[in-house]
């Protein structure tokens, strides 16, 4: 029994020895590598960081291998630092890597902050891409040292296995770009331009093809800015222009059938006792009783080619602002018709002259009884009581065509359907004399020439007012509280060769004396239509735009009389105000001003546009929440709501847009706009 036990123990020892012999023999030396020798195949392999043997697929665990690796590599300075997380924590973490962990702050400091897609910021993304492409090439020294170490310790059949970290870059893990990278090797310096060129292009909006981001921004500002519901859109006003040549001015009110009295008008529209009210009165040479024209409206029934027609219209948004007028002696019955326009405002009196009882003229009436709904406010400007004009009322009408001349002794017949009741006894056909050849409709001469108020060279001659709310070939002498805005379209179309007509304005009383607004009533006579066609042919030769630059032909007037009245003259030049400090930079601005020749004529507004449509849109919506003051010389200034003082040239934009580009002088409301301008401009 003892013999049997000894035999079994001997067999177990033999099997144990055999197992140990067939197993892998581990050789641990003071070198940098651990070599496992396979007893079956005699194929040594270098194992780093406890990897499995690739030649035979058997796993071998050695206790303390990582510690031996770390100790040997740290002691030998000639060894190549192969990737191991424990080693990298101590040797390859540089201050630049630590700073990269704070890449959001770095990106903001370099001006790339604020732009992101989701949780990925543009600054960190671009910085990572640039650094990765710059360090995408593996250093040649690392490859050479690793191959030399491998060849010194292994044979031709040996394999070298290198383990790379499998975690994302962090404090404990070095970033990828410090070693091997699979990023494409392209020029990282051209990355930003290529990115902008690839993505910031080919926009499409409203059926328009917008090639660049600037074009998209301009289109958005011109077409997609929300406007006030009180804004008049002139394109929505219909106009009858086919065949019907009988033009009539009807006294109607489409919104109410009740008669308006003077007391209701004063109670609804007068805010304080100091506010002045205006009236429109019609006088006849045969009677002394004054009758008022109730809610004038012009049926737009003449051809587009007719050069002289009294036209008035109103957008539905302005129905609440209908001009209400009271009969002073006799009542006028209300008839159905179109909605009257609020543009016929201010002090206007239709009277007939002694020379010709059929001549219709509109003159100033300082003491009037017509009240307007929310159209005039009075402010104390520099100690004087002046009228403030809302911009919504100023930029209402427009026209593109040059004015027309009417020859001497031209008379147009009008039938009973004309609807102009100058007196209750007037029901017969009337001949309306259109005045002499000296009574011409004035057109402002140049761009910054704001001759709004005009008087005739011959004050005895009285002409009637012409109003055209559409983009027709008629002269736009549109008045909003006695303010003519046709100068804006004249600046666009260029100067014309008409005689100047001046007006006298008293800023202390707010009264305006209009003696020369020339117009005609188009009749249905075919003979008159032929004559109008002849007039159009004559005027086409006269209304030729000058080739000179509008900015070089700006006129100004500095003289004033002792009683506070200022007379505007077209023979003076207004200097162009420079808004940049450096004269050298001003040359740059002058060179680029040709690209945007259309400038807003309001003093204190620096808006310029490349085309006419941009200025038209700005006229309607650019000064929505501002008040404009009419200066004695006929210009407009933006009123400061805080101090009720008018802004000087450039002062309004400096307050609303405090951030200014020092090179070109452009101003922006916030700093982001200025940053975008600096990043995308050529200067």
From Swiss-Prot:
Annotated segments matching region Disordered: 156-178, 305-324, 332-357, 399-420, 498-517, 535-573
Subcellular location: Cytoplasm; Nucleus
Major subcellular site: cytoplasm
PROSITE patterns, per the entry: ZINC_FINGER_C2H2_1, ZINC_FINGER_C2H2_2
Zinc fingers (C2H2-type), renumbered ranges: 598-623, 659-683
Gene Ontology CC terms, in alphabetical order: cytoplasm; nucleus
Domain of life of the native organism: Eukaryota
Protein name: Transcription factor SFP1
Other observations noted: [ISP+] is the prion form of SFP1. [ISP+] is the result of a conformational change of the cellular SFP1 protein that becomes self-propagating and infectious. This conformational change generates a form of SFP1 that assembles into amyloid fibrils. [ISP+]-aggregates accumulate in the nucleus, and results in significantly larger cell size and increased drug resistance. [ISP+] can be cured by GdnHCl. It is speculated that prion properties of transcription factors may generate an optimized phenotypic heterogeneity that buffers yeast populations against diverse environmental insults. Present with 259 molecules/cell in log phase SD medium.
Post-translational modifications reported in the UniProt record: Phosphorylated by TORC1 kinase at multiple sites. Phosphorylation regulates nuclear localization and RP promoter binding.
Entry keyword Transmembrane helix: no
Region (Prion domain (PrD)): 230-458
Cited function: Transcription factor that regulates ribosomal protein (RP) and ribosome biogenesis (Ribi) gene expression in response to nutrients and stress. Promotes RP gene expression under optimal growth conditions. Leaves the nucleus upon environmental challenges, resulting in a down-regulation of RP gene transcription. The effect of the environmental cues on SFP1 localization is mediated through the TOR pathway. Also regulates the expression of genes involved in the G2/M transition during the mitotic cell cycle and the DNA-damage response. Required for carbon-source modulation of cell size.
InterPro entries assigned to the protein according to its UniProt record, in alphabetical order: ZnF-Chromatin_assoc (IPR051580), Znf_C2H2_sf (IPR036236), Znf_C2H2_type (IPR013087)
Listed Acidic residues bias regions: 535-557
UniProt keyword annotations, A-Z: Amyloid, Cytoplasm, DNA-binding, Metal-binding, Nucleus, Phosphoprotein, Prion, Repeat, Stress response, Transcription, Transcription regulation, Zinc, Zinc-finger
Subunit structure: Interacts with the target of rapamycin complex 1 (TORC1) in a rapamycin-dependent manner. Interacts with MRS6.
GO biological process: positive regulation of ribosomal protein gene transcription by RNA polymerase II; positive regulation of transcription by RNA polymerase II; regulation of cell size
Annotated SMART domains: ZnF_C2H2 (SM00355)
This protein's domain notes: The prion domain (PrD) is a Gln/Asn (Q/N)-rich domain, which is unstructured in its native, soluble form, and which forms a parallel in-register beta-sheet in its amyloid form.
């Amino acid at each position: 029994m003892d013999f049997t036990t000894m035999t079994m123990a001997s067999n177990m020892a033999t099997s144990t020895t055999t197992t140990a012999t067939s197993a892998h023999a581990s050789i641990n030396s003071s070198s940098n590598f651990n070599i496992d020798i396979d007893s079956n195949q005699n194929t040594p392999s270098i194992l780093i960081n406890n990897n499995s043997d690739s030649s035979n697929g058997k796993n071998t665990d050695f206790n303390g291998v990582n510690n031996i690796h770390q100790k040997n590599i740290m002691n030998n300075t000639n060894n190549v630092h192969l990737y191991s997380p424990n080693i990298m924590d101590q040797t390859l973490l540089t201050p630049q890597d630590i700073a990269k962990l704070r890449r959001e702050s770095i990106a903001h400091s370099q001006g790339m902050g604020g732009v992101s897609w989701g949780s990925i910021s543009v600054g960190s993304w671009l910085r990572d891409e640039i650094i990765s492409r710059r360090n995408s090439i593996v250093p040649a020294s690392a490859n050479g040292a690793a191959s030399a170490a491998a060849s010194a310790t292994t044979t031709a059949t040996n394999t070298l296995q290198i383990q790379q970290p499998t975690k994302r870059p962090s404090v404990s893990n070095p970033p990828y770009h410090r070693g091997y990278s699979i990023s494409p090797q392209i020029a990282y310096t051209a990355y930003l331009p290529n990115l902008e060129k690839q993505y910031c292009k080919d926009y499409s909006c409203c059926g328009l093809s917008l090639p660049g981001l600037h074009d998209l921004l301009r289109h958005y500002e011109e077409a997609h800015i929300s406007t006030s519901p009180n804004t008049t859109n002139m394109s929505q006003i219909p106009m009858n222009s086919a065949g019907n040549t009988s033009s009539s001015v009807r006294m109607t009110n489409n919104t109410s059938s009740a008669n308006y009295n003077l007391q209701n008008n004063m109670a609804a529209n007068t805010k304080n006792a100091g506010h002045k009210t205006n009236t429109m009165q019609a006088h006849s040479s045969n009677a002394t009783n004054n009758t008022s024209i109730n809610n004038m409206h012009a049926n737009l029934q003449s051809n587009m080619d007719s050069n002289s027609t009294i036209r008035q219209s109103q957008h539905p948004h302005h129905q609440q602002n209908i001009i209400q007028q009271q009969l002073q002696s006799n009542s006028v019955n209300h008839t159905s018709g179109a909605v009257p326009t609020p543009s016929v405002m201010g002090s206007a009196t239709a009277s007939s002259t002694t020379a010709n009882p059929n001549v219709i003229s509109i003159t100033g009436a300082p003491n009037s009884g017509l009240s307007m709904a929310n159209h005039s406010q009075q402010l104390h400007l520099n100690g004087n009581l002046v009228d403030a004009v809302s911009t919504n009322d100023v930029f209402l009408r427009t026209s593109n065509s040059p004015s027309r001349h009417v020859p001497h002794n031209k008379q147009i017949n009008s039938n009973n359907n004309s609807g102009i009741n100058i007196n209750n006894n007037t029901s017969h056909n009337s001949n309306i004399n259109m005045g002499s050849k000296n009574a011409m409709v004035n057109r402002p001469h140049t761009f910054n020439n704001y001759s709004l108020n005009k008087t005739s060279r011959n004050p005895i001659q009285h002409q009637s007012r012409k109003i055209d709310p559409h983009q027709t070939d008629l002269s736009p002498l549109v008045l909003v509280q006695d303010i003519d805005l046709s100068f804006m379209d004249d600046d666009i179309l260029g100067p014309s060769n008409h005689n100047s007509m001046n007006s006298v304005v008293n800023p202390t009383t707010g009264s305006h004396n209009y003696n020369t607004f020339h117009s005609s009533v188009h009749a249905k006579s075919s003979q008159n239509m032929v004559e109008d066609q002849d007039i159009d042919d004559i005027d086409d030769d006269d209304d030729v735009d000058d080739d000179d630059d509008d900015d070089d032909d700006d006129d100004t007037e500095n003289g004033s009389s002792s009683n506070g009245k200022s007379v505007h003259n077209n023979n003076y030049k207004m200097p162009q105000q420079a808004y940049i400090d450096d004269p050298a930079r001003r040359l740059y601005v002058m060179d680029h001003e040709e690209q945007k020749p259309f400038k807003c004529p309001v003093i204190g507004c620096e808006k310029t546009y490349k085309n006419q449509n941009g200025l038209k849109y700005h006229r309607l919506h650019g000064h929505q929440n501002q008040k404009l003051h009419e200066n004695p010389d006929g210009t407009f200034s933006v009123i400061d709501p805080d101090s009720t003082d008018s802004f000087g040239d450039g002062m309004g934009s400096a307050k609303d847009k405090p951030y200014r580009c020092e090179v070109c002088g452009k101003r922006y409301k916030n700093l982001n706009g200025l940053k975008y301008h600096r990043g995308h401009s050529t200067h």
